[in-house]
């Protein structure tokens, strides 16, 4: 019996067609609302669902690309106390996130890949926006008098 999976299961991912025994389909998949039987109506719905998922995926990629451009144009300025050779403190992911939010950019703290910047001058921080997209944020640290 051919069925369309509604949710991810051990048999496959959501929105895929699989072939299972009628007993398994009736007693487990349909009962737990994990799948629906394959017929012309559900097949048309599956095609529409896949198209909608593809459109949403492309829109998300476009948003990520715009966000990457916006982040890479930005320069954040921080002040740290210290003398000529040593710095007192560090710029952490939490501080970077807070400054980005002030500028209207919202990213997850775990996306900011830094272990703390503790040197004066210009540094670059990677911000992981998706599995394939990483933006480089420019950070300038000056001495606080």
Curated annotation (Swiss-Prot):
Gene3D superfamilies: Ribosomal protein L9, C-terminal domain (3.10.430.100), Ribosomal protein L9, N-terminal domain (3.40.5.10)
Key words of the record: Ribonucleoprotein, Ribosomal protein, RNA-binding, rRNA-binding
Classification via Pfam families: Ribosomal_L9_C (PF03948), Ribosomal_L9_N (PF01281)
Intrachain disulfide bonds: none
Stored PROSITE patterns: RIBOSOMAL_L9
Any one Gene Ontology molecular-function term assigned to this protein's record: rRNA binding
Protein's job: Binds to the 23S rRNA.
Family, per entry: Belongs to the bacterial ribosomal protein bL9 family.
HAMAP family (UniProt xref): Ribosomal_bL9 (MF_00503)
Superkingdom of the organism of origin: Bacteria
NCBIfam families per record: L9
Protein name: Large ribosomal subunit protein bL9
Any one GO CC term of the record: ribosome
SUPFAM superfamilies: L9 N-domain-like, Ribosomal protein L9 C-domain
